[in-house]
């Protein structure tokens, strides 16, 4: 839980008086009245939640369905106005199409007034949304994700007499993520205001809607009935609710007499609609199909993650929803599809757990293919059926000529089909068929009669058992994958740990016949009989309790009627019974005249069992008085767990927090623009999470780190603008309010789920506080030696070959306390290496206090809970939230140490540093834990391959398998290796090297036939190449169950040229240099002669032009000058600029 500082109202200044007794009395009265008010409203106030479309936010009575599954572009204009904020307006901010509208109500009080009062007191609803991962881990990586948000208050649109009197609601965005269609919403307060218990809602995607031409939403699977008639329920008995556990976004329930209608809900029956299905209802009965009559009733209905299945008569239909977050829209159905048209299907059986990335449904045949079974597989919305066994019938392996498969259940992890088979003599067999190896085994021959078990809670069925005259009538099977418990039920209950030896539960009467079973998969089970009785028992125990009808039920019903509860009536009919989050719920139709309605209500098993418990007492004399002393039925006074791993870490849940931006409005109310900003920020936060897959390890492996990396230094400036009402749009975005949480507080208690990697372990301590007489006896003044008989804790492992457990006990006599420290360790045997979510072994540990089940009830303000027994699910395999990353920082540091230098590229790239070709390259990797925030060096073994490359980032191409072998394998003989190493360890086939953090490193080769051979420089810088490397530890690492696979790019510079090209360049360069030297020498020798010739040539030209210049002068003067010039010409030319030249020039001027 994330807490924020809240403003406290200023206390009034009370005048000082010598005596303040009156004040303290008044204060005490006020506190007592507040306490009584809190206790009175604690269990009655409840949260209200509806879904609003983006454009309908602010409409008080608006309610929408989760039909749109893609983000919308509606907030970009708002973000462009946020100039003075830490966000980058140039980023593309999208939004989700829905908001969550939150409010609460308290019986007998004005809800609108309560909401305004709570807001003014500082109450803020906190919303935590948990996303369920997809069953197809091949397409979507298994991850547990949750986001914590704070709801923003907003006045509803419409008329209100005064601003402070407007209807108030709280809003948060309703984000969704790819690979998830099921999301739970937990709502609770920040601890201020009225007491409202935390409540969970399911807001699931609905892929079975369509829009008509006007844009109105309609159901694609049928026609919605606006009226739910009582006649729909008077002639119909209760029926089971079948669905894939934790993954079905919608629930469907058939069974309406002679009507092709179903109840449909996308909120776990928080609301619902009645749909008349649009199916053809063809009658194809024949002599292959021994069905006597036709009925429109939908007999079986099963919901999976994406597909709905129904059976009407002998026909089976399916409809695949349109879920763009799971698969392509083209996989969705436009109408009901009939499958197995030539088969006569007598029953559909559910498969509660997925396996191998798919879901399953079982169809039992009758008629011509009696003895066969059809297994339906659903993968990405695509449905296929396979008939097994192939080529032979189950009946051929059993005594007699004919047989009938009455029930089937599929163990997906083992690929085993458990079949309840009846032969023509009436004998029932439990048969196992393995779909992988196509083998069939008879596991157990079910007794023909009910065993004799007078005054016993249970009976182990051995050969010495005596039987009554009441025949056993098996009706079905139930298998719990978590604890390997198998149940055969009918007018009896048989349970088995190993599917071969069975225990008869004697508390269930043979006069009743079970109609269906429901399981919480947390250790509790309930059964409904043909007479609508409800029986309850705890797995791992042997006691079966009747809760409806019972004395406790009659007492509870009277109390509810006295309180005028609207959920109970004297005339009602049970529709279905199902578990939700360990709580047992009834779907009941109430036949109150004028108020007929269908309600979902909690069946308080703990309260009913407490009312049913005997109240033993004794009368003792105390002086002159007699006192009644009640005997404790529970062996302990209190129980709790300490030193427990954090639930977030144990269940491997990644958590984010997103709080609304602060607004400058005086009362703190938001508007459409501020909520749009909230939408965009939440979308961007989850977008960063989905895109965070950097192969290079960041200094902080947090998706939000780069978001605010360069903005945090200005946070005081942004707050200054906001506090002075200078911020754009009056909004302040707190950067610390959008981040990842690694250590959530407030999640105490034993986690609901543990993930264990190879060889990992976890510990916690169970504290049992005993009654005063546990450690002492009447004949002993000190501690008794028989404490174990009064207070003892047992641990039961569902798969002891997979896990080991140790329990260390410590007695604290002075505190009457027993401490039991429990440590569970993985034995490294029951799971194989694989990607996240694959090869997960589902198992559990049962913690049980001796004598506690059924006798220990804890009373809380949320109801009564059964104590002393707890099933702890444990998943063995690669846990979610771990990734491998290239530790480039340490690789550079280590490269500098071993090579005594490090040369980066001339043009540096901080995101992708360079490595020199001639240096030894030794990569290091980090295992980053995205749940805890920890990271550490990967110390396991791995195989490194160059799987692609190119001269630039844009020209990188992936190599073929043949090329990968030639470029990386030590067995290559084509002179194509890119690199080599001195490591001697190789894979079993000798094809590739096996490396580790202790390996000597990689030496780059780039031989003649490799793609990096003889790279021509494109500029003055040396040649460079980009290598695409693949690192995988699959099959070579024994330190983890995780199959790490990392692909990253390494930039190598300074690649050498080939010998031919080098020789050619040397020859050309040498020749050019020699030519240049020769030219220089020749130039130095010839240049003086060239200069002398030029001067002589110039002088001659000058002399030739001189007579023409002076031809216009006087004859005497010209003759004299000419004569003088003629004489001087015999002396040879003088150097320019000499003294003689100057004298001659002066003479010529005078003349």
UniProtKB/Swiss-Prot annotation:
Keyword Membrane appears in the UniProt entry: yes
Membrane-crossing residues?
A: 1064-1084
- Give the GO cellular component terms, alphabetically: CatSper complex; sperm principal piece
Q: Where in the cell is it found?
A: Membrane
- Record's signal peptide: 1-38
Carbohydrate-modified residues: 356
Biased-composition ranges for Low complexity?
Answer: 1113-1123
**Listed name of the protein:** Cation channel sperm-associated protein subunit gamma 1
The organism named in the record is Mus musculus
Question: What lineage is this protein's organism placed in?
Answer: Eukaryota, Metazoa, Chordata, Craniata, Vertebrata
